[in-house]
Amino acid sequence: MYPQQIIDALRHVRYPGTGKDLIESGMLEDDIRISGLEVSFSLIFEKDNDPFMKSVVKAAEVAVQTYVDANAAVHIHTKFRKQNLQPQEEHSPLKAKKIIAIHSGKGGVGKSTVTANLAIALARQGKRVGLLDADIHGPSMPKMFHTEDCRPVSVEEGGRTLIEPIEQYGVKMLSIGFFVDPASAVVWRGGMASNALKQLIEDAHWGELDYFLIDLPPGTSDIHLTLVSLLRLTGAIVVTTPQPVALVDARKGVDMFRNEKIDVPVLGIIENMAWFTPAELPNNRYYIFGHDGGKNLAEELGVPLLGQIPLVQSIREAGDDGEPIAMQEGHPAAKIFDEIARKI
């Protein structure tokens, strides 16, 4: 074995956060050591809580054994450009192991439906889940969780007055929809919306959480920049339909998170409304918005495809009734959300 063979093998491994191979991403340290069938080298990650670290290290090992020598004993060390920073400052009431933003480039692709069902799926798996409805101008979580008439109360914690999130179906939740007239439009400038969002994060009694999901507004706005400045996001999920016009904006969403000023790992793409299945013909699939658009985009950008969700009437009805489909154990759609939840 020769060092150049190792380098060439690692060109076959993509880092999901950028879509580039390990060499192009500058992740290989100049420390390749070879002794007989033993080879060692180091991979450099930006931070020590990189969500892709384990999978990338494994893929690198497999690449050497596949493209260089099947009997190679591969030893991979990890180094970090930045040490792990706490997701929040110590004084913040928000303490979450994973903070995940769920985004769509275009409205109407089912992002909020996906977010609500993922939150419930995680809660049903025994996780402590918080959900922030950050879609200030179009909050939909109160409706989807059947909590339109709920109003958060204040609690005292450590000498501070905090907002107590509404808890429903095992999910702690806050939304601007709890504080405004549901029949009135929220007409705020970017600064007002960002300040309201900041208060829902910093002045709320979230407690200890395993997952904190953020339902982002579609597109790009001040709200997205506010979140990045307030929280150290574990990663982002992009929701799209297979329709070409939606894929254009989904691509922009991935590019936004990969921008060096944002620098948030893209955990994957969810293709919603992947096909239509009528209730009377559960085995039939009609690709009314296109076939595998989200899947193909994920492959092109080098990010995981977390799942494909069909367009079925029961998902829409469950959300409108305030009891998302993920609550229906055994339902085919609930199983899909459960599988996606386990991947994140």
List each language-model region with its residue ranges.
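N-proximal, solvent-exposed amphipathic alpha-helical segments enriched in charged/polar residues
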Residues: 1-32
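Residue-level signature of catalytic and energy-coupling elements of molecular machines
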Residues: 10, 28, 96, 107, ...
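Extreme N-terminal, non-catalytic leader segments
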Residues: 24-27, 35-103
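Conserved catalytic-core segment of NTP-binding enzymes
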Residues: 57-58, 210-211, 217-308, 313-317
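Walker A/P-loop phosphate-binding motif and the immediately C-terminal alpha-helix
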Residues: 98-136, 262
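Phosphate-binding loop that captures ATP/GTP phosphates
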Residues: 122-183
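Switch II (G3) loop of P-loop NTPases
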Residues: 152-155, 176-191, 198-226
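C-terminal boundary of histidine-terminating zinc-finger modules
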Residues: 321-331
